[in-house]
Amino acid sequence: MISAHILSRQATRPGHRGPRFTTHSTALLVQRSLGQGLPLAHRRTTRAWESTSSSTASTGSHKESGHIETAPHESLLFFNNLFPLKLSSILIWRPWTSEDLLQRFEQSSYSFIDPIRLVKRAINTHDQVPIEVTQIIPRLKDGGAFVKFTHPSDMSAAVVESKLSELLQNNPIKPWFNPFGRVKAGLVEGVPWLEDLYRLPRSRIRVEFVAAKDDASPAELSQETLYSIFRKFGKITEITSQPTDSKVLPRFAYIDFVLVRDAIMARNCMHGFVLREQGSKNATKLRLSYEQRVKAHHIWAWFTSHPRIVIPLVAALIAAFTVAVFDPIREFFVKAHVQKYFEFTNSRLYKWFKSQTSDILAFRRRKTEDAGLNALFTHRKDLIDSIQTGLLESVDTFTVVHGPRGSGKKELILDQVLKERSNVLHIDCKPVVEARGEAGTIGRLAFEVGYRPVFSWSNNISSLVDLAVQSTTGVKANFSENLESQVVKILQTTASALKQVGLSERKKEDKDADLSEDAYLEAHPERRPVIVIDHFLHKSEEKGVIYDRIADWAAALVQSNIAHVIFLTDDASYSKPLQRSLPDRVFRSVTLGDLSPDVAKKFVISQLQTDTKFAHDGQQKDSESGDQDNDNKNQKKDSNTPAPLDPTLLKELDTCITALGGRLTDLQVLARRLKIGQSPRKAVQEIIDSTASDILRMFLLSKSSTSDRKYTTEQAWYLISHLAASPSSSIPYNSVLLSNTFASSPETALEALANAELITVKSQNGMPSEIKAGKPVYQAAFQKLASDEKVKARMDLLVLTELAKMETQKIEKVEQELVMLQGLMARRPGDVSERVEYLLEKMKGGQARLKGLEKEMGVVKGQMVKG
């Protein structure tokens, strides 16, 4: 930073013995500053700040060398606290120099705050100090100024400093920017370095010990010596010597001052100071510079040194922030999903448009479906009324609707039981369980309940962070969450939103407005939302934890009177997981079976009566006359009157429905085939053929690894063949367990086949009693497969081969035991002879059975060759 040369003014009043000035220009400038002896125009044109030195070279010497030259009987004083310390950092990129800045001060209307005037006041107001000021050099960066002065030969510079400091102590001069501070003066004992580098003052001083002469070695000063030298400038907090094992040269020490102003005074007064310690031959020069103090950062150091505490704490804070910010948003979206805020079909505009156009636009397909379902729901009206009545009661238990797939569970509950309910949450477990990966599962579950925003991808990133933290610190940060915890979080947020939904219709004018929220929900079961959990226990062996958490969540909802819960499942073992979540409770179970032949026939007829192809004259053919077409056109005019069906068609339906059974999905397929012009007999036959083909592909000719299935192809064929040959369309459960084909894990195999819906296990008094086909059409498909000679021969060969393999293994075990007993026969024949005879008889019987199996295999192979 380039320093300006400042002229101090001289007092002009008579008898004044203040500082004197050495040049004529000095007097002129003093007169100018006092406003005397010069005309106004001259006062305006005279430069404000000029050097009092007579030599131009000496004037700019410190600008080039960075040092101030002094003559004999000439010394330097440093005045502190004249400028704000931050001024230099603010003006670091200023386009003007220090001289320009000081000229702006004087020429402006704010010249009364000129910092150089403080120096003049400190010097000129005290006639006790007989000095002559020759030069004033401001230091904006250090917040002070150097004053060069001459003193009488009989008075030392130290005495001048002492008197001046005493006067400033008794008559303090306070700067305008710091009314609580005061100007201080110190004698410059060294050689100050006037640099203009960007080195801002600090409270820490680095003192380097260098040799006063090039050929000498410096001495390292002790802390006591440094304290005695620098204590006069201000309070010192710490003196740190260089470590003894350090090889850094030159040797140094750190001195920490309490105030930055004290460090500035010490640096400007003692830089270049030369001293000689007692007993030392060589002199040591002190070279001072500001040093950035490394802050302790105790809090950060504690955090980094205690990762076992800090990392879980940070994770907890992040979780708390997430809950505070995102949970209210997610609860809002769940409420909107349940109450259907954003669905267009729930808007007033759509409802008005639908009411205005319902008599004009005919939605034929929907009308056809409604006709068939209405016939079905009329048959099940008692079940519908029973479930609706249960939703009006305050009973803390589940409602479970069980039935085989395709029995109409979802349509019964959503389209009939909950038709008039507005607050219904439908959760389909099938897409949740079938989703790929944890992120997909969480995303699907969040979609089902309306939980958003959801950052399912963030858990993968959190897992990587956990891995990185654990590998570096050895502590698991627990930023990531497992699948179970994420499912619980979504369900808890959903429960909170459902409670708000149940309380949304509560008003202050109600008679029971003084009740608590829980008491209100208990007293008004009709206000609670209804949760329908569809496809419960679908593929439960893959992601059973999801079903466990859903069951626990549903149990908490019904026990807290927050919502009614209805489970829809086709798994007969639904009671096990539900009993774990809600023990000591009796569930409201509703079982939907296959329709009886009469109801099934009515269902198909109701589907067909809405289609004009099945009018009184029979099925239309390509050769029908135009008169019949006109009759059909006349019948279309009255769409509300069911069209009578052809009697021939009705007779065929009686026999075909008996073979097809009463499964709702199969009846719908039959109705669609009849609508496209197929006869009932042909439609049923094609359904049976398609079903048999599916069974053959999925259970008998499947190329999937046997390790992925809990049953074998031979076991599936055993059940198919025996059910096809059974007059009652069923086989005893225990007879299957005792068969050789099911010798290994029979119950596991039967359970797997039941879950695959190939068979149905009927129970009596809680115990499995008989086995039937998975659905009625399967029985006809089994008979078709068993009557196919090629399929039967191939499957029988597999069964015989497996049985022969089992007999061979039994014989090999007997042979191994006989070899072991051979040594004992020679020593103690009486003890082992009975066992040997038993094994020989067993081996004989096994060999006979093996021979018979091989004979049967030969016959089957012959049939396959002929076929």
Curated annotation (Swiss-Prot):
Membrane-spanning residues: 309-329
Protein name: Mitochondrial escape protein 2
Intracellular or extracellular location(s): Mitochondrion inner membrane
PROSITE patterns assigned: RRM
Biased composition (Basic and acidic residues): 614-639
InterPro entries tied to this protein: Mt_escape_2_C, Nucleotide-bd_a/b_plait_sf, P-loop_NTPase, RBD_domain_sf, RRM_dom, Yme2_C, Yme2_RRM
Cysteines joined through disulfide linkages: none
Source organism: Neurospora crassa (strain ATCC 24698 / 74-OR23-1A / CBS 708.71 / DSM 1257 / FGSC 987)
Keywords annotated in UniProt: Coiled coil, Membrane, Mitochondrion, Mitochondrion inner membrane, mRNA processing, RNA-binding, Transit peptide, Transmembrane, Transmembrane helix
Stretches the record annotates as Disordered: 1-20, 44-66, 614-647
Topology Mitochondrial intermembrane: residue spans: 330-867
Protein family per UniProt: Belongs to the YME2 family.
Span of domain RRM: 203-293
Role this protein plays: Plays a role in maintaining the mitochondrial genome and in controlling the mtDNA escape. Involved in the regulation of mtDNA nucleotide structure and number. May have a dispensable role in early maturation of pre-rRNA.
GO cellular component: mitochondrial inner membrane
Mitochondrial matrix face of the membrane: 42-308
Gene3D superfamilies named among the record's database cross-references: 3.30.70.330, P-loop containing nucleotide triphosphate hydrolases
Gene Ontology biological process: mitochondrial genome maintenance; mRNA processing
Chief location of this protein within or outside the cell: mitochondrion
Transit peptide as recorded in UniProt: 1-41
GO MF terms held by the record: RNA binding
Stretches with biased composition (Low complexity): 48-59
